[in-house]
């Protein structure tokens, strides 16, 4: 009896498809970025999510809240022209972008819930938009000259936002408890997949 020279690779649920459509690749990459960021922040208490490095005002909790807002902004306001949903509508903005990253007045449970609920809500919005018009669906927002991005552009912009802040999350999490790694371990369970 012989054994195979290699194991068959079984991708985790957040892995983008090896062979898929453009929409599957974009949504798969977004799913992996969401899962990676969530794993980087997973399992922390209030203090862990509020921890900052001396050179920055960023915290893991602030990144989770900011990206939850980014999801809603891109896929509600920019895509559909609709007002932001709660909890953003009643926060009382201070005319700076800093309020988006504020997590000190929220518990870990509240912060995780805001992020997880935004991911679930916006996954549905993406699925609905793809069913309606695919990646070429024209967004509500324009550049002031009547040029409207397509859903494809909004997804790429959202991926860029995640990529930028997932790098920040690497440094923040390592400073909290030493956790490092590129992707969640295969046995990690995502709260939104």
What are these regions (language model features)?
Residues 18, 77-78, 105, 116-119, ...:
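Generic alpha-helical secondary structure signal
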Residues 96-137, 150-162:
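Acidic/histidine-rich alpha-helical segments that form the ligand environment
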